[in-house]
Amino acid sequence: MNYQVPRGTQDILPKDIRKWHRLEELIRQFCHVYNYDEIRTPIFEHTNVFKRGNDSSDMVNKEMYTFQLENSSTSLTLRPEGTAGVARAFVEHKMYGYADLPMKMYYVGPQCRHERPQKGRMRIFNQFG
């Protein structure tokens, strides 16, 4: 049995978590000053949220963690970036109808890409956008 994190991932240990909390708090404070609202979307979405018509980008073709639900035609993908999920939420919840436009939103959280790990590049990483 293998008791190590998968290649390209890492644990954030108690000795380091305060730094992460502080960074996230600074991001939230900065965004609050400029009237941005935080949005949180699911860690996985329907695969078509990330696929665009005729998209041949590496991220779509090679770097997404996609899985098929058992006994179903449903395909889900771990989010490789945050923007597509935010756009999906904006449309799904008709946010254009009850908010002043343009809306100013931000997200911060883990993203997952199946890319070759290298120095400074992990398969699970945090992104602010």
Task: Spell out what each predicted region is.
Residues 1-129:
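TRNA-recognition modules of translation machinery and tRNA-sensing kinases, especially anticodon-binding
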